[in-house]
């Protein structure tokens, strides 16, 4: 078996650990179980020790990390389950199916908590859009997300899209889902002793075998051999499974639910047993199959989609079978919990594997020594040279640049209103807002991350990601409750890669503590590199908040004659900025500094302004700086503005800095708004007034003016050309 262990990529030290835990040599089936359960994708061997440091508790938290999704209270007996998941490696090989099954998987995570999925957000990263491969991947991924989400009837209400050369070979596809549930319907992956465990949903085939292990290694140039590791999704079957599962939960028929995702039956059953402090006996001959002659290994490791395991309450077995029968789905007992804490597998009457559940679930962990990449330090410490450029032209070029142009060409492919809960449409606000029907409550959600910041300063980049996601949720009027993190990085086995992982998590910890927003779920995807080139450390942070749905703010200027104010400093920084890259073609300099105390105060202030009815228009100043944000505010309703910028230079017009928010207020209430800001000791400036069909900016160097038509034209075309070309 040692030779086989080496052949399938189990390190020598881990093989010895397996032998020690079993007290004997494993057989072939057992060795393959350890291969997938001890993969980085399932076991988090390198990240688990670091993730322990993240704050996980908060007054709204019902369920933190460790289950299929996190859950927070939002009021009136309602709760929201949410999580972000990656499907990076499959999407690099088969972008359509990789993205589609990524959506399917995260939907099942949410419904396994007893929640009805109500919204999807996607966070996507690709190489330069002028390259054919990037365009191919983008089109396939967007189509896959639309295919699954639209067909299953869950709206895609927001997301985050970035192009960067660091993702040329390794695209990132992260999907976030929110689900709504009554607090009393919350389910967990648990079972009591002697209970049957039911297999429900699609029949098992050979698709996706080895997917967990595939997601735990570096991508190679030749990808044809990886195609069998990519699963195939069926959203129509997924819809039936969702309705049947939620009906069973609502009828109080089940005590435990578990999605069947990475590592298939092996992971779902062994984890359920381990969390319950029990063992499980699985009879593979009872598993519904769609292919002939499947071996024990194939049945155990298949990652066929649209499958769940459920544990019925005593006496509810027949009722459970009837519910799934009405939806035309298989629902059969395949296993039973046992007192011995082992994962026992039988095939044709023989035991083919018997492994302690703890041995499978508790993989070895690694704490390594990290070292900053000297090239990253050199780039960060490179001084910014004097930059000369015509601001008139710079704004047009920024609006047309891949990372700042309109995302309408993407989100118009998604159904973002199915379910009739969407209270703030894509492009209308800084975060998505969904209404909880029958209440006054709304739920806001946003995903954020800036690869330039993270590449040059992993810790600060992660802090910015959480701060901006919280800021965007606050700017629509919602109080951030908790976050989910999708950590996407290269190999942790190099000192530089491990340094980036450790620093990213340290940054999240610092921002989480300062902002009072805990983590409740997440995902770690490592080995995102090719040919030794790592992706930028990418912490996709998804924040969920709660608000009174009628007191929400949009980003667009709604009417002329309102006063426009800026909270925060007028001047930004050029390091790691979009304008610096636009003018030099290079990425360097120190990312903007972040004062987390100031950040929290700014977020509280804008929420108060919205809740008091002082403003209904607010927008954060982020990538592209002040003028870019002002231009974005003119687009939704075609209302312009005239403003004065007192500071000189590109830093004032296009520099980037956190803790800045633009908002409007009626002239009669200006004093109320400014008094609120003064009481909190926050810097602010009255910039000007809304109105007209142009954006006019008075600067120390003269007057700048753009027609709204020219700005809108520059902003709308680029991404459409990429997707339609």
Swiss-Prot record:
Disulfide partners: none
Cited InterPro entries: PRibForGlyAmidine_synth_PurL, PurL_linker, PurM-like_C_dom, PurM-like_C_sf, PurM-like_N, PurM-like_N_sf
Subcellular location field: Cytoplasm
Pathway note: Purine metabolism; IMP biosynthesis via de novo pathway; 5-amino-1-(5-phospho-D-ribosyl)imidazole from N(2)-formyl-N(1)-(5-phospho-D-ribosyl)glycinamide: step 1/2
Main location: cytoplasm
Active site: residue positions: 41, 87 (proton acceptor)
Gene3D superfamilies: PurM-like C-terminal domain, PurM-like, N-terminal domain
The keyword Magnesium appears for this protein: yes
EC number: 6.3.5.3
A biological process from GO: 'de novo' IMP biosynthetic process
GO MF annotation: an example: magnesium ion binding
Keyword Phosphoprotein: no
CDD domains associated with the record: PurL_repeat1, PurL_repeat2
List of residues binding ATP: 66-67, 83-85, 109, 485, 522-523
Catalytic activity line of the entry: N(2)-formyl-N(1)-(5-phospho-beta-D-ribosyl)glycinamide + L-glutamine + ATP + H2O = 2-formamido-N(1)-(5-O-phospho-beta-D-ribosyl)acetamidine + L-glutamate + ADP + phosphate + H(+)
GO CC, one annotated term: cytoplasm
Residue sites binding substrate per the record: 86-89, 108, 211, 231, 303-305, 525
Organism domain of life: Bacteria
Keywords linked to the UniProt accession: ATP-binding, Cytoplasm, Ligase, Magnesium, Metal-binding, Nucleotide-binding, Purine biosynthesis
Binding residue positions for Mg(2+): 430, 472, 620
Known role: Part of the phosphoribosylformylglycinamidine synthase complex involved in the purines biosynthetic pathway. Catalyzes the ATP-dependent conversion of formylglycinamide ribonucleotide (FGAR) and glutamine to yield formylglycinamidine ribonucleotide (FGAM) and glutamate. The FGAM synthase complex is composed of three subunits. PurQ produces an ammonia molecule by converting glutamine to glutamate. PurL transfers the ammonia molecule to FGAR to form FGAM in an ATP-dependent manner.
Subunit structure comment from the entry: Monomer. Part of the FGAM synthase complex composed of 1 PurL, 1 PurQ and 2 PurS subunits.
Family: Belongs to the FGAMS family.
Name of the protein: Phosphoribosylformylglycinamidine synthase subunit PurL
């Amino acid at each position: 078996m040692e030779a086989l262990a080496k052949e399938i990529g189990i390190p020598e030290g881990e093989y010895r650990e397996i032998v020690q835990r079993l007290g004997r040599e494993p057989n072939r089936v057992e060795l393959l179980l350890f291969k997938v359960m001890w993969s980085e994708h399932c076991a988090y061997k390198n990240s688990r020790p670091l993730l322990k440091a993240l704050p996980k508790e908060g007054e709204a938290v019902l369920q933190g990390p460790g289950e299929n999704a996190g859950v927070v209270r939002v009021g009136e007996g309602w709760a929201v389950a949410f999580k972000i998941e990656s499907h990076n490696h499959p999407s690099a090989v088969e972008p359509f199916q990789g993205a589609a099954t990524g959506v399917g998987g995260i939907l099942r995570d949410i419904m396994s908590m007893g929640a009805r999925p109500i919204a999807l957000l996607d966070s996507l990263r690709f190489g330069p859009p002028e390259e054919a491969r990037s365009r191919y991947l983008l089109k396939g991924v967007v189509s896959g997300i639309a295919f699954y989400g639209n067909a299953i009837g869950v709206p895609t209400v927001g997301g985050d899209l970035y192009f960067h050369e660091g993702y040329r070979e390794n695209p990132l596809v992260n999907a976030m889902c929110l689900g709504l549930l009554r607090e009393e319907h919350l389910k967990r992956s648990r079972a009591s002793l002697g209970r049957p465990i039911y297999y429900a949903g699609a029949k098992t085939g050979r698709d996706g075998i080895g997917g967990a292990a595939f997601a735990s290694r570096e991508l190679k140039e030749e990808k044809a051999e990886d195609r069998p590791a990519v699963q195939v999704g069926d959203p129509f079957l997924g819809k039936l499974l969702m309705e049947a599962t939620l009906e069973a939960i609502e009828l109080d028929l089940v005590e435990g639910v578990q999605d069947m995702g990475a590592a298939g039956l092996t992971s779902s059953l062994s984890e359920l047993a381990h969390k319950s402090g029990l063992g499980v006996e699985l009879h593979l001959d009872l598993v519904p199959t769609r292919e002939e002659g499947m071996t024990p290994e194939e049945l155990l490791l298949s990652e066929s989609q649209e499958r769940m395991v459920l544990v019925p309450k005593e006496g509810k077995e027949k009722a459970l079978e009837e519910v799934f029968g009405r939806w035309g789905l298989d629902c059969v007992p395949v296993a039973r919990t046992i007192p011995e804490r082992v994962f026992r597998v039988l095939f044709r009457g023989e035991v083919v594997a018997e492994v302690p559940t703890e041995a499978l679930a508790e993989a070895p962990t690694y704490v390594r020594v990290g070292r900053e990449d000297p090239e990253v330090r050199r780039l960060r410490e490179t001084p910014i040279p004097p930059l000369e450029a015509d601001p008139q032209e710079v704004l047009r070029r920024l609006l047309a640049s891949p990372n700042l142009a309109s995302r309408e060409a993407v989100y118009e492919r998604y159904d973002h209103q199915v379910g009739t809960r969407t209270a703030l449409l894509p492009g209308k606000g800084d975060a998505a807002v969904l209404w909880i029907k029958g209440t006054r409550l709304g739920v806001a959600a946003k995903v954020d991350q800036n690869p330039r910041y993270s590449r040059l300063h992993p810790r600060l980049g992660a802090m910015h990601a959480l701060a901006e996601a919280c800021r965007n949720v606050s700017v629509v009027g919602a109080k951030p409750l908790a976050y989910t993190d999708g950590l996407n990085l290269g190999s942790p086995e190099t000192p530089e890669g491990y340094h980036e992982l450790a620093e990213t998590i340290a940054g999240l910890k610092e921002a989480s503590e300062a902002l009072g927003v805990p983590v409740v779920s997440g995902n770690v995807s490592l080995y995102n590199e090719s040919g030794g080139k790592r992706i930028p450390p990418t912490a996709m942070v998804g924040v969920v908040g709660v608000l009174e749905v009628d007191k929400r703010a949009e980003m667009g200027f709604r009417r002329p004659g309102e006063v426009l104010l800026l909270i925060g400093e007028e001047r930004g920084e050029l390091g790691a900025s979009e304008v610096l890259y636009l003018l030099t073609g290079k990425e360097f300099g120190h990312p903007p500094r972040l004062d987390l105390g100031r950040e929290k105060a700014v977020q509280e202030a804008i929420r108060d302004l919205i809740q008091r009815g002082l403003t209904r228009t607010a927008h954060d100043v982020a990538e592209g700086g002040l003028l870019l944000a002002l231009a974005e505010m003119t687009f939704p309703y075609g209302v312009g503005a005239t403003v004065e910028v007192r500071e000189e230079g590109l830093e004032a017009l296009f520099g980037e800095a956190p803790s800045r928010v633009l908002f409007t207020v009626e002239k009669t209430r200006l004093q109320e708004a400014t008094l609120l800001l003064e009481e909190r000791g926050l810097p602010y400036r009255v910039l000007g007034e809304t109105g007209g069909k142009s954006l006019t900016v008075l600067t120390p160097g003269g007057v700048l003016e753009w027609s709204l038509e020219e700005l809108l034209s520059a902003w709308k075309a680029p991404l459409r050309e990429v997707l339609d070309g």
